């Protein structure tokens, strides 16, 4: 019976429409310019492994002034910054660009500016402070749970079926550059209403979509990860609905292992990498970003928020 069902699932899968969508690498513009303030540290958000915007060593007022003999000196979390470092660019006018940004580059950056507005005047001094944070996009996925009427819980048929179901679901969404992973599978004895005990398999899967950096182009909206993930959800839901329809039309006896109608659930889940979290109050200019956890906070797992930890003194802490 179980083998008959697997054959049916494979036939259904082969009939499923193939959906292909590949995305080209987006060109990143670094033309954004960030101006400092003497009143408060300006927050700057830099995507991991990308270059920062142009970070200026001037205020809005000085930006439109002529500065005589300006001297710029940048300091970062590790001390003095110099263009001798391959990941640091400092222009003659004091503009800072950080390339291939890493987690450990997050922190407080200061620029000391010495200048004159009139040649005969003494030097003026100004210190501008920035808080620069690494961030990444949320890693989101669907969590899929489903139940099957099963063979006796000690039967190897259940294990074989679980592997085959994973393979089938993975193949179903492969053309979307998505993948399915088994989180856990459990067999339980279930007491039926006004009936005896029956064995049921409880499956939990995750459905994720990969970043696609290919040369083939397609419409951006159709290649976005959320769009592909929703499409994968539609294909999986259609697959289980189709299985119920075919079983209801069949005159054959029920197989030993079969999907229990109505048990499929797919829940959208957001997550950040360990050491990162979403906080729209603390980071209103990057409200949906997974921003590196500041000192006095941490995120130990793939959660969604940084948690308070008064003993943590570093950026990106994963332990307290």
Curated annotation (Swiss-Prot):
Membrane topology listed for this record: Peripheral membrane protein
Keywords: Cytoplasmic vesicle, Glycoprotein, Membrane, Secreted
Compartment list: Cytoplasmic vesicle, Secretory vesicle, Acrosome; Secreted; Cytoplasmic vesicle, Secretory vesicle, Acrosome membrane
Glycosites: 85, 158
Listed Pfam families: EGF_Sp38_C, Sp38
GO biological process per UniProt: acrosome assembly; binding of sperm to zona pellucida
PANTHER family xrefs: ZONA PELLUCIDA BINDING PROTEIN SP38, ZONA PELLUCIDA-BINDING PROTEIN 1
InterPro entries: Sp38-bd, ZPBP1/2_C, ZPBP1/2_N
Family: Belongs to the zona pellucida-binding protein Sp38 family.
Function comment: Plays a role in sperm morphogenesis and in sperm-oocyte interaction during fertilization.
GO cellular component terms given for this protein: acrosomal membrane; acrosomal vesicle; extracellular region; zona pellucida receptor complex
Higher taxonomy: Eukaryota, Metazoa, Chordata, Craniata, Vertebrata
Protein name: Zona pellucida-binding protein 1
